[in-house]
């Protein structure tokens, strides 16, 4: 079973995304914080990561940079999602593989998940 990790401090977003992903047959883990992001991801080894920008402890940009600098984790696709669409270029520079603006279209969300997981 493919696994997805979602980092977002908005509980409603976490619940909505989890429901959609589980309906697609994916295993989901969530975290409202980027505290120990490398350890969190290493212990789960997801096939895909969704990363919000505004998170406690460190920004999604900084967390993405850490993940992409880690030899063990750098090949896991990171989809950046944020209400601030102006941040997409910074996310790209940090190593994000894709960007979704919030609020996101559910069909676009599912399409992005399928693109990166093959489900």
For the regions a language model picked out, list residue spans one by one:
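Two-component/phosphorelay signaling modules centered on CheY-like receiver
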Residues: 11-29
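The feature encodes the CheY-like receiver
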Residues: 14, 56, 74
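Short amphipathic alpha-helix used as the core "switch/output" element in two-component signaling
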Residues: 61-74
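Acidic catalytic/metal-coordinating carboxylates
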Residues: 32-33, 59-62
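Hydrophobic/aromatic residues positioned on beta-strands within the core alpha/beta folds
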Residues: 79-81
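Active-site residues of response regulator receiver
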Residues: 52
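Acidic, metal-coordinating helix/loop segments flanking the phosphotransfer/catalytic sites
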Residues: 30-48
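Alpha4 helix (beta4-alpha4-beta5 surface) of REC/receiver domains from two-component response regulators
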Residues: 62, 84-100, 108-111
